[in-house]
Swiss-Prot record:
Record's keyword annotation contains tRNA processing: no
HAMAP family linked: Ribosomal_uL4_B (MF_01328_B)
NCBIfam families according to UniProt: rplD_bact
Subunit comment: Part of the 50S ribosomal subunit.
Pfam families per the UniProt record, alphabetical: Ribosomal_L4
Organism encoding this protein: Psychrobacter arcticus (strain DSM 17307 / VKM B-2377 / 273-4)
GO molecular function, one term: rRNA binding
Listed name of the protein: Large ribosomal subunit protein uL4
Cited function: One of the primary rRNA binding proteins, this protein initially binds near the 5'-end of the 23S rRNA. It is important during the early stages of 50S assembly. It makes multiple contacts with different domains of the 23S rRNA in the assembled 50S subunit and ribosome.
Record carries keyword Ribosomal protein: yes
Domain of life, per lineage: Bacteria
Family: Belongs to the universal ribosomal protein uL4 family.
Disordered as annotated region, ranges: 45-64
InterPro entries the record matches: Ribosomal_uL4 (IPR002136), Ribosomal_uL4-like (IPR013005), Ribosomal_uL4_dom_sf (IPR023574)
Length: 200
């Protein structure tokens, strides 16, 4: 597959990594698994057995005219336990390496088809200057973008840190969710070659 950078230079990339047909079910499964794995899963509520107190019967069974009650910690009482209390849970799902690789191939290929992937020889700033980076992004027509480089340049990272809807990642940090989340993905040729190596 032949792609062109912003300056018009031709870049040849593998069809396996960047030309795969889009498989919506696969991408959905991998993205869902990734988001599920990001959940903390630490929420905890108390059942009637775990709430403090409520051991004694509040009033006798018969003769009071009131509804029968065995504990002041019943789920229908104020201050009682939860009927179906949430417990800590591991939400992570297993994703095979082959599936993950396939989903990444599908996403990258779809970004190219939708013209959301912008290839550049390199993207850098002379210092941690946000204004300079904003000007470069506007020049590329991508004010809201994910910038992917082979290695994160500290100046680039610091310049992008305060811009909403802009993030800088190196190839090892890129995941399916971040690729989908941004309007445009600005990728250096070196990063594209690294993806090609990893996904081909």
């Amino acid at each position: 597959m032949d792609l062109k950078t912003v300056t018009g230079a031709a870049v040849e990339l593998s069809d396996t990594a960047f030309g795969r047909e889009f498989n919506e079910a696969l991408v959905h499964q991998v993205v869902t698994a990734y988001l599920a794995g990001a959940r903390q899963g630490t929420r905890a509520q108390k059942t009637r057995a775990e709430v403090s107190g409520g051991g004694i019967k509040p009033w006798r069974q018969k003769g009071t005219g009131r509804a029968r009650a065995g504990s002041i910690r019943s789920p229908i009482w104020r201050g009682g336990g939860r009927a179906f209390a949430a417990k800590p849970q591991d939400w992570s799902q297993k994703v095979n390496r082959k599936m993950y690789r396939g989903a990444m191939q599908c996403i990258l290929a779809e970004l190219i088809r939708q013209e959301r992937l912008i290839l550049v020889e390199e993207i850098s700033v002379s210092g941690p200057k946000t204004k300079e980076l904003i000007a470069k992004l506007n020049e590329l027509g991508a004010p809201r973008a994910l910038i992917v480089t082979k290695e994160v340049d500290e100046n680039l990272y610091l310049a992008a840190r305060n811009i909403p809807h802009v993030n800088v990642l190196d190839t090892s940090e890129v995941d399916p969710v971040s690729l989908i989340a941004f309007d445009k993905v600005i990728m250096s040729v070196e990063a594209a070659k690294q993806f090609e190596e990893a996904l081909a």
